[in-house]
């Protein structure tokens, strides 16, 4: 049990992309200090009957019925349009001292919003630990060295956002040591061979995706 005052506060942020299952959402919220819906993510929370602590965004996606359902929940409207609803939620959580964030519903739906949500993660990684997830998959923005649990035979893919160097992989079928990788180069469909996988990136921005769903390759 962490000592009082030493554990980082945790939060779940639910976005307006592909909805997570109710089981995943309820389990995540149960273990978090705060549950925040980024705008239309509140519609999914309502469908799953999981009440948020806060709804934040420009409120152009959340329905009137959901706002009525959220009565008693704090609702913060941020009108500025130069950042996404996810960024609005993360900015708010920084003011609350939250250090660990699980983002659900960030992918799926509109492709531009999916790419936008993923690309802004590195703006926050120096101040909080962030994981994006859905049913059976997780995405981790790498800063320095990332060590994570992975079910053996899970698919582990590396997606560079630009040029990356000093890439070292451990616990994977195809290891690398001090390698380079640029956007467009193949880093997908590696395989976890141990229960713990390590990824080090000395320079650049890398997204590591762990997929535990058994699906046929589309390439």
Each model region followed by its residue ranges:
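N-terminal beta-strand-loop-alpha-helix module at the start
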Residues: 1-69
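General beta-strand structural signal in soluble alpha/beta enzymes
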Residues: 14, 36-39, 57, 77, ...
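Short, well-ordered alpha-helix to beta-strand connector turns
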Residues: 32, 52, 72-73, 98, ...
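Short phosphate-binding loop-to-helix
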Residues: 75-96
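Short Gly/Thr/Asp-enriched flexible loops that form oxyanion-binding sites at enzyme active sites
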Residues: 111-122
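Class I SAM-dependent methyltransferase SAM-binding "motif I" and its flanking Rossmann-like core
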Residues: 122-151, 156
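Long, charged alpha-helical interface segments
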Residues: 142-219
